[in-house]
Amino acid sequence: MAESIKQKPARLAGPGLPDFRNLGVMLRVLLVVNLLALLTVALRADDAGRLAADLALMAGRVELPLLLAVLLLYLLGPALRRLHARAGQAAVFAVASLAVMISSPLTGADAPALLRALAWSWLAAAITLLYFDYRNWRFTPALAEARLMALTARIRPHFF
């Protein structure tokens, strides 16, 4: 007896990239990176009076590369989805690096500042990708349970 296509369980999502064309994903990327910038400023602050000024400086350094990276990830979204998981993650790091390098002439950064910005962007990209992997891992059991409940609801009328 052949199985119905609808009854075959869908392959659960493994480690991979989120859909960078989704507005929710874009919002989460912006929030995670901005929270990391806020945390960086809070950890580095010596004086509470300079916290607002340091936060404004950090926002000036972070926002342009961040928006550029989100735009590039949006444009490259379909190509990134076709890549293997590790290659896609490497491409995200490359996009983050490219965004920093493109925006660095506008900020007038010297070589050490550029290296710090690249390192910070790699750290932010790694934490953001880890967040999406963790989120995917947490939702996987819920999806399997929802599929089982839907199947049970379809079968129940035949037996009661």
What are the residue ranges of the model-derived segments?
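Hydrophobic alpha-helices of bacterial signal-transduction systems
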Residues: M1-T140
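Conserved HAMP-HisKA connector
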Residues: N136-F159
